[in-house]
A protein has these predicted regions:
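Core alpha/beta nucleotide-donor-binding catalytic domains of modification enzymes
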Residues: 1-78, 87-102, 107-110
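Conserved S-adenosyl-L-methionine
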Residues: 21, 88, 113-125
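Short catalytic/ligand-binding loop motif for oxyanion handling, primarily in non-cytosolic enzymes
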Residues: 45-49, 90-93, 127-131, 145-147, ...
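A short helix->loop->beta-strand "cap" motif at the edges of active sites that frequently abuts
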Residues: 77-81, 114, 133
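A SAM-dependent methyltransferase catalytic signature shared across enzymes that methylate proteins
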Residues: 103-120, 141-143
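Residues that flank catalytic or metal-binding motifs in active/ligand-binding sites
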Residues: 105, 117, 131-135, 288
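Flexible, glycine-/basic-rich loop-and-beta segments that form/coincide
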Residues: 128-206
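C-terminal target-recognition/interaction regions appended to catalytic cores
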Residues: 202-315
Length: 315
């Protein structure tokens, strides 16, 4: 019998499954059933472009420690496969030591005996109506893979999301700056500082060695656009309709969407020059949309919200 707080879909789709709505750090790893695939993701607040770079602390940040909970479960249960998803900034984090966080993750997976594939996938490159980039990480316990062909055609991610032939594959060892995680954490890519991460948009790691390259999606199927998935104007609720006055208001939509170079003052009184480029406004209907973020909808002006024009605006 269902209680008022129960979700009937949980019972109809998996009545005998185990659902634990609890902080994972409080769960004893031994109590987790044996499984073949661990699938998950990290909070994106530490890496996402929704925040400015100085606040993107990566795995050294408070929320980033979720990775070590995943690591704890892997260490105890040793599932054969691992599938993770995150924002693509993970490959570049943190700002002052590009690629360190991902290097620490790869090195810790190597210590547990996993071979790893990763790919940054832009949904729009495979026909979806949104330009949304995410990095997918697939790992296999004692995985046997050919590095070059795994990236280009034979890997799990390459088979699911084909790419064009690779131009160049770079390789390096994770242990160049030391063998343990502490050395990698403190020394990896330090000489490059905030200039460049060594990790390309695709790659593999096996036995502590990394092969990586820039990957371009190879897709010739149907391609959707923002205009093709919109509701018809007559079905849009009034709360989402903007009037011309709101659009033209000083420091409103046009200001927020536009490019700017201006002096600003922080809460501590420090003044600095702020600049950013323009965002297409209204959003173009003939191509995939910009990345959709939390906080869409409503009439309050925002640089990140999507605005489309159904008919000429008066005024």
């Amino acid at each position: 019998e269902l209680s008022p707080t129960d979700d009937p879909l949980v019972y109809s789709n998996g009545a005998d499954d185990i659902f634990v709505n609890q902080d994972i750090s409080l769960i004893d790893a031994e109590s987790i059933p044996d499984h073949d695939l661990l699938c998950g993701g990290f909070p994106c607040q530490d890496y996402s472009v929704a925040k400015t770079l100085p606040t993107a602390h990566g795995i050294s940040g408070k929320k980033g420690v979720l990775w070590w909970e995943i690591h704890r479960i892997l260490e105890e249960k040793r599932p054969h496969y691992l599938l993770l998803e995150n924002v693509d900034r993970l490959l570049k984090s943190p700002r002052n030591q590009r690629g360190r966080d991902f290097a620490v993750m790869l090195a810790s997976l190597n210590e547990l005996g996993y071979a790893v594939e990763w790919r940054v996938i832009d949904a729009s490159e495979y026909g979806f109506p949104q330009r949304r980039k995410r990095v997918f990480i697939f790992a296999e316990q004692n995985g046997k893979l050919n590095p070059h062909s795994a990236i280009e055609k034979d890997g799990v991610l390459a088979r699911a999301f084909p790419i064009h032939e690779l131009d160049n594959v770079e390789t390096f060892s994770l242990s160049e700056d030391g063998d343990d995680l502490a050395d990698i954490s403190s020394k990896f890519n330090v000489s490059k500082g905030d200039k460049k991460s060594p990790f390309g948009s695709g790659g593999v790691m096996k036995d502590g060695t990394v092969w990586t390259s820039k990957c371009l999606g190879n897709y010739d199927g149907e391609k959707q656009t923002l205009g093709g998935v919109l509701q018809t104007p007559g079905t849009v609720p009034d709360e989402y309709i903007l009037d011309a006055e709101a659009v033209l208001r000083q420091r409103g939509w046009i200001y927020l969407k536009g490019g700017k170079k201006e002096m600003r003052e922080g809460r501590d009184g420090f003044t600095y020059k702020y600049s950013e480029g323009p965002v297409t406004f209204p959003d173009a209907l003939e191509r995939p949309s910009r990345t959709i973020v939390t906080g869409e909808g409503g009439k309050s002006p925002s640089r990140f919200k999507h605005v489309v024009k159904f008919r000429p605006t008066k005024g």
